[in-house]
UniProtKB/Swiss-Prot annotation:
Topological domain ranges for the Cytoplasmic compartment: 164-232
Membrane association type: Multi-pass membrane protein
Stored Pfam families: Ctr
Function: Required for high affinity copper (probably reduced Cu I) transport into the cell.
Protein name from the UniProt record: Copper transport protein ctr4
Source species of the chain: Schizosaccharomyces pombe (strain 972 / ATCC 24843)
Subunit structure, interactors included: Interacts with ctr5.
GO CC aspect terms: plasma membrane
Keywords, alphabetical: Copper, Copper transport, Ion transport, Membrane, Phosphoprotein, Transmembrane, Transmembrane helix, Transport
Extracellular side of membrane: 1-142, 254-289
InterPro entries: Cop_transporter (IPR007274)
Chain segments annotated as transmembrane: 143-163, 233-253
């Protein structure tokens, strides 16, 4: 404030001297002494004006306002220069602020639009980009992502048929391992029944339940995907089921034949046992004469 007050006082004194000399010159012809006096006053006036402008830009709003008023009261040209520079700086700051705020708003708007751009429909549709399935993280943002999702759906349905095939093979193994026909001695006498223990039965049934749980989960996910009514998804659900059954479902024909053979074997063993019991009963029956 001391520098600014001193500059203001010096500038005021210079203006008083300049006004006095101009008043004297207006009453008579301009002489050489008046011109030399004006030339001596102009350089200090320009220096003080520049210093006042720099001080006004670096100080607070009140100081800058007083600096602007002081400069406007000195010389029209210097006031215009300082006003223009202040206006330019404020215009640049306002432009930068506006650009920054608009950029931030545009970014936020774009992010919000991208986060809420999932296309959902309760009718038949063929959406590819911006389609969402089951969760918000499964958001299709490109064609490559959509193709990868389609292949994932196909492999999921093929894996379902593979699990079903695994359960059938496990059931066949259990039948072969613990079937009464496999433990019978048809040619030496009555069949010997040696079934699995209770703990083994519980363990085997637990494994079969795990197979069933996996099938149920995959089938439920397939149902949820189909509920989006996307034509591509439903089409490739069918394709995955077809390819899966084509690769892993060929055993169903032989299963029926093997089951009928096993049934005939069990019936044959039962008939032989019945005949054996009948022969023993006839041997022990006393004959009457």
């Amino acid at each position: 404030m001391s520098f600014f007050s001193a500059a203001k006082q010096s500038l005021g004194n210079s203006l008083i001297k300049l006004g006095t000399s101009m008043a004297q010159n207006s009453q008579g012809p301009v002489d050489d002494s008046s011109l030399s006096q004006l030339e001596n006053l102009l350089p200090p006036l320009q220096i003080l004006t520049a210093r006042a402008a720099m001080a006004a830009m670096n100080m607070s709003n009140d100081t800058s306002m007083s600096g602007m008023n002081m400069t406007n009261s000195t010389t029209p040209m210097s006031g215009m220069n300082m006003t223009n520079s202040t206006t330019s700086m404020s215009g640049m700051n306002m432009s930068n602020s506006t650009t920054s705020m608009s950029g931030m708003n545009m970014t936020n708007t774009t992010t919000t639009a991208k986060a809420s751009s999932c296309k959902l429909s309760m009718y038949w549709n063929w959406y590819t980009i911006d389609a969402c399935f089951i969760t918000k993280h499964w958001h299709i943002t490109s064609k490559h992502m959509f193709v990868g999702s389609i292949f994932g759906i196909i492999f999921m349905m093929m894996a379902l048929e593979l699990v079903r095939r695994g359960q059938r093979e496990f059931d066949r193994w259990c039948v072969r391992r613990f079937s009464p026909a496999s433990n019978s001695c048809c040619h030496s006498g009555a069949p010997v029944h040696s079934g699995p223990s209770m703990a083994l039965r519980i363990f085997l049934h637990f494994l079969r339940s795990c197979f069933y749980l996996v099938q149920y989960i995959v089938a439920y996910i397939a149902m949820l995907l189909a509920m989006y009514y996307n034509g591509y998804v439903i089409l490739f659900l069918f394709c995955g089921t077809f390819f899966g059954y084509f690769l892993f479902g060929a055993d169903t024909i032989s299963t029926k034949a093997s089951s009928s053979v096993q049934t005939k074997t069990i019936v044959q063993v039962a008939d032989e046992k019945h005949e054996h019991d009948s022969s023993q009963y006839s041997d022990t029956t006393p004959t009457t004469e």
